[in-house]
Each structure stands twice: as C-alpha cells, then as structure tokens.
Amino acid sequence: MSASAATGVFVLSLSAIPVTYVFNHLAAQHDSWTIVGVAALILFLVALLARVLVKRKPPRDPLFYVYAVFGFTSVVNLIIGLEQDGIIDGFMTHYLREGEPYLNTAYGHMICYWDGSAHYLMYLVMVAAIAWEETYRTIGLYWVGSIIMSVVVFVPGNIVGKYGTRICPAFFLSIPYTCLPVWAGFRIYNQPSENYNYPSKVIQEAQAKDLLRRPFDLMLVVCLLLATGFCLFRGLIALDCPSELCRLYTQFQEPYLKDPAAYPKIQMLAYMFYSVPYFVTALYGLVVPGCSWMPDITLIHAGGLAQAQFSHIGASLHARTAYVYRVPEEAKILFLALNIAYGVLPQLLAYRCIYKPEFFIKTKAEEKVE
C-alpha cells in the first residue's frame, strides 16, 4: 500500500459533510426504518469505496476498512457536536430529533466530541500505519479501551435512562459499533508486541530494586490505593448507599451522579467493576517483577479512563445538564482536581509501563521455566 491510500481515507471521511446534509433533508420525509436502512447503506458504501481505494494493492490488515468506516462516523459525530452547539445548522437536526434523541444529552454531546476528535485522530494514525506497513499495536490498544468504555456506558445508559422509552430503530446502528471494536481488539492484541532489546544486566538491576527504591512507582502505588477508594466510594453512591457521607458528597460535590439520564450511574459502576480490579492487578504488577502483561492492560485501561473522564467531567459541567444536577460553583475546584487527577493517573502509569518497561520484562530464565 502507499501513502495515497491513507490520504484517500482522510478525504473519504470528509465526504460525511455533504452526505449528512443531504441525508438530513431526505430523513425528514421518511419513516424511522427507512432512515436506518439508508444509514446502513451509506456505511456499506463507505467500506466499498475504501476497498476501491486500495484495489491495486489491498492491505493485509482487514481492520483498514473498519477504521475507514469509523473515521467517517467520527466526522458525523463531530458534525453532531457542532450542530448541538449552534455552530452549524441543517446537517443532523432531524436525525437528532427522531433517530437518536439521547445524543442531545450532555453525555451524548461529550462523546460526540470525543469520537470526532480523539478517536478520529487515532483512526487516521492507524490507517497511515497500515498503509506504511508499520505496527500500531500501542495506539490500537489505547483506542480499544477508549471505544469499549464509551459503548459500555452509552448503550446501557440509552436503555435504562430516561430515554429508555424512546428507543428508536436507529438504536440498532449501535450493534456494529459494539461488535467490531471487540473483534478489532482481539486482532490488535494478537499482533506481535514490541521487542525490547535491553541487556540482561539492565533488566536484572531494575528488577532487583524493591518498591522503596523506586520513588515514582511508590507514588503510583499510593495513588492507585487512593483511586481504588475513590472508585468504590462513587460506586456505592451509584448503588444508592444511604450513608450520610454519600448523601453529602452527592448533594454538595457531584449531584450529576443522580442524573436520571443514568449515564453517570453506569459510569461509576463501570469504574467499580472494571477499574477497581485493574487497580488491584496493577498494584501487583508494580510490586512483583516480570509481569509482562502490565503494558497491555495499562494501555487499554488508560484509553478507557481518558474517554470516560473527558465525558464525565464535561457532562457534569455542561449547560445541557439540568441545573440541579450540575456541579455547584463553589465545588468546581475540588471536583476538577479530583476528577482530573483520577483521569491523569492511568496515563502516567501507561507512560511508565511503555517507556520504562525493564521492570516488567520477563527474564530468559522465567521464559524457560514457562
């Protein structure tokens, strides 16, 4: 493949601008099932056009076509976000009203912006890597964590929240958006991991140091313990814990956790049942040398937390959130400090695991034993 294929995918994604404008005007004249059928046909045509772009020399990685289609939908989501803010008009108005009204929520608004910016950049990078026949395993795992976290919260939130009674046929468009990332995740994970050619002496010296002689790791361990407590606490709030401390925190710090849209509740439960086990596992990996799986799971978790905290912080402060559920003015500084710190911690841990991996590399003796 050549670099022109990656450029073609970029141009193809920008075709979402005229397509959404025409689609919006046609959708206003047809029923919901017709809208879903046309939307599915458009996505199929995007995949077909991506195939035509690389007809002479098709990519070895079939995920090229997945990223091409998802890149197109990312531009659609960016258009939705801009239309919700009143920057543009007439592109997705009817679809937002009749197709997926839950995208009009503060949380829906934030994930549209995340998908239209962060995910879009990741798709372009991964398409370019495939075109140049280079590995993209690191950014791929980060993307897997990010998109799966958004699906885990957004799809159930649409069903159990206040929009549960307004589920439209367009909801079925979420099925490929749910299944394809899982399939992509397995393919990315099975790609050859990066080989670290560190001398045995360097690895042995790094792994001989206990936790007290690794101050950065010690700081990470302390932060992981605090983050675990924070996750459990907010998870209990999501489960309607009647304790006075939970009530006061919800009333004066994060009233958004009680939003009837249900996204914050599901997000806190995802933290409780996804992040807490990860934190415990990461604590083990920072203490016991040779845990070669640490960089991979850390990347996936870092991607998930980046998406989740961006959406949660934004929705908590957003004007589309009812005033009674928004973060109080006097609590904003503490709210931002806690939530930004909670979102940054996994990024620091991922940086530590990827760029200084000596402690996590298995020695040749351990590999022989296995």
UniProtKB/Swiss-Prot annotation:
Location, primary (coarse class): membrane
Organism of origin: Homo sapiens (Human)
Function of the molecule: May function as sterol isomerase.
The family this protein is said to belong to: Belongs to the TM6SF family.
Pfam family, any one: EBP
Keywords: Lysosome, Membrane, Repeat, Transmembrane, Transmembrane helix
Compartments in which it is found: Lysosome membrane
Membrane-related topology note: Multi-pass membrane protein
Domain of life where this protein originates: Eukaryota
Record InterPro entries: EXPERA, TM6SF1-like
Residues in EXPERA domain copies: 60-185, 216-350
Tissue specificity field: Enhanced expression in spleen, testis and peripheral blood leukocytes.
Entry's Gene Ontology cellular component terms: lysosomal membrane
Signal peptide from the UniProt entry: none
Protein name: Transmembrane 6 superfamily member 1
Transmembrane annotation, as ranges: 3-23, 34-54, 62-82, 110-130, 139-159, 166-186, 218-238, 268-288, 331-351
